[in-house]
Amino acid sequence: MDLHTAVYNAAHDGKLPLLQKLLASRGREELEELLGEVAGGGTPLLIAARRGHLDVVEYLVDHCGASVEASGSVHFDGETIEGAPPLWAASAAGHLAVVRSLLHRGASVNRTTCTNSTPLRAACFNGHLDVVRCLVGEHKADLEVANRHGHTCLMISCYKGHREIARYLLERGAQVNRRSAKGNTALHDCAESGSLEILQLLLSCHARMERDGYGMTPLLAASITGHTNIVEYLIQEQPSHEQLSGTELPGEGSSQMAGNHCSTPEDAEQYESCCPTSREAAVEALELLGATYVDKKRDLLGALKHWRRAMELRHQGGGFLPKPEPQQLVLAYDYSREVTTPQELEALITDPDEMRMQALLIRERILGPSHPDTSYYIRYRGAVYADSGNFERCIRLWKYALDMQQNNLEPLSPMTASSFLSFAELFSYVLQDHSAKGNLGMQLDFADLIGVLSKGVREVERALQLPKEPDDSAQFTKAIAIILHLLYLLEKVECTPRQEHLKHQTVYRLLKCAPRGKNGFTPLHMAVDKETTNVGQYHVGVFPSLQVVKVLLDCGADPDSRDFDNNSPLHIAAQNNCPAIMDALIEAGAHMDATNTFKKTAYELLDSKLLAKSTVQPFNYVTLQCLAARALDRNKVPYKGFIPEELEAFIQLH
């Protein structure tokens, strides 16, 4: 073990005598080196603060000159936090003495991590009230510094259910109606976490029932998460605003909560009148809650109970509230339509499958197609059908969800990528199942495969039409890889000449938009790379794939295309030791003696320990022109401007 690691481990374990021994008599430069980051990104001071070793922290700062602001990587609950200062780590872990010590030694109370999380947010997240009081009450920490998502300390306290911290932040003037980047408020966080007491507290402070970026109110947020207590509280009969006009606000004269004009949860019912729940909102909340009971809680009787209440509210005094007429019935939902009468509702009890379709219909109507939960539960229901062997029903639902995602989400959305991968895994399983069972297994339809492949190409086209290149190159690479896996599976399905033509048209669309994955890989590079095999948890296709390579070449893929290291697909095939694929590339016109950035030919990259070299004979493909080009390059003979441009490009190829 080297000295650097030994110092880190001693700080981690709180072994001050050992640490003093290791660092004694060290010069300033050597101390700076030893107190710097280790391989994992942490520092001795950071890990000592994380572990709560006060004596080690003070020794490193006072006697070794460790910076109280030096940030690094630290682990919490299985997650790596990048750019965390020691004060953040101590606050997150709840080590009050270490927090006070670091602040006394000059640590910035509002110093953030790479995600803009403050020490105060870390303490709020983990419920350390004493640390929160220290940071805010003693050192004036800024309550309103939000993380990169616009999520504030009050919001995270509400979401995690830390009532006393939420109360304290409100007392200190936290903005109760602050909105995050996605438009949600602290009320939304309470509704999603099911914390009724904190929700009452927020309402007593005049929190408003706002809609977030998806059009969701806190009431609907409680419905989709299945928190019946929140839903019941918000839809219960409340006194009208006029009834309370002129009523003095309890606690209004209080010095601590005057900024928010709130007092205690017990007074919340008086203030609920500021945001009464309409009959229509209550109906939708109960209907959506019933859908949640079907799909999330798997409680069909509980769902019926909530749907009955919603139906009763629709028919109560004040005028009948009809459901909107559907524009068209959906094949994926088995052409089901929502029930509209109490009799139709009661008939559902004998048809569980129809109840599940009702849940999907209700969710799509209320949340709309752009809300992630809408497509998520359609995919969930499809997966349940697949598990029971009903692959056709699954494919219909998944195709409907995929269309919904592509029409409403940004290109390369993780949810859309997950849908494509699920299709590839399902198709692979169906093909294997049919191979094992013969006529008893489901026959995979060409139309289903080519339809999903075409949508995959469309996703790449959408991403490349953006004003700038895709932010996440890994996600873009994965999208191309999934398309290649779908093509791999399609090669296992018998095609008519017309279907073969349609397949080639789809592949041509992909090649025409010239997508580039990691390190500048073209689809042809990826088709000859074994790393393309790894796209998900389950096995789909195997790469390198000669069949996929041939299809790409037939559709016009350039066998001499280059990646960022000037490797051609032939180089990558050689690195993967695939002589059969190399032969196919050479027959398609790939130059055997073309060199990469490191002046290596594909033949030179073949594994000498294997027999592949004996099957590939480079001199069968090298021309005198190729040898002359390499001689010019090897001897540094100037040629630019003295020969035609076409010949210059040929020499540069070598």
Swiss-Prot record:
Primary location: mitochondrion
UniProt entry tagged with the keyword Mitochondrion: yes
Pfam families given in the database record: Ank, Ank_2
Assigned keywords, A-Z: ANK repeat, Cytoplasm, Mitochondrion, Phosphoprotein, Repeat, TPR repeat, Ubl conjugation pathway
Regions crossing the membrane: none
Protein's name according to its UniProt entry: Protein fem-1 homolog A-like
Species per Swiss-Prot/TrEMBL record: Mus musculus
Secretion signal span: none
UniProt cross-references to Gene3D superfamilies, sorted A to Z: Ankyrin repeat-containing domain, Tetratricopeptide repeat domain
Localisation: Mitochondrion; Cytoplasm
